[in-house]
Amino acid sequence: TLFASQFSLIDKLTNTYYETHGTKRDKEAIYTQVRNEIEKLQTNKRYIQQLEDIVNKHKGNVMQLLRESMPEFSEMDHRLLCFIYAGFSAKAISVFTGDSVGNIYMRKSRLKAKIAQSNSENREDILRYIP
């Protein structure tokens, strides 16, 4: 669940902090742990699928509706919208995707427009969760 995964991450970071606090390598160890978690969101398909499952569970199966309604979207488009639905900031998404913050906003706007102009009966449900 979202609750368990959030606290699991905090637990990992806290353990790393506890084990390295006061040493020369404490900042490096925390940085490495954070970098490892970010890399999961960049490349680990299982981890990304878990995020999508959480979004579906808490946001009315919006990712399922999106995938069914907009099959022409690329996997990166789906992933961007999943990150947005999950509540990540443009800066965080920029780190996950390697794209600039400006491009994140531009892609988000372009995708919203495509969804709004689509003939999908689910377009309002899909757009509801995009701020």
Sequence positions of predicted segments:
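Cytosolic signal-transmission helices at domain junctions
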Residues: 1-5
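Cytosolic nucleotide-binding catalytic cores of signal-transduction proteins
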Residues: 36-131
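Histidine phosphotransfer helical core of two-component systems
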Residues: 11-50
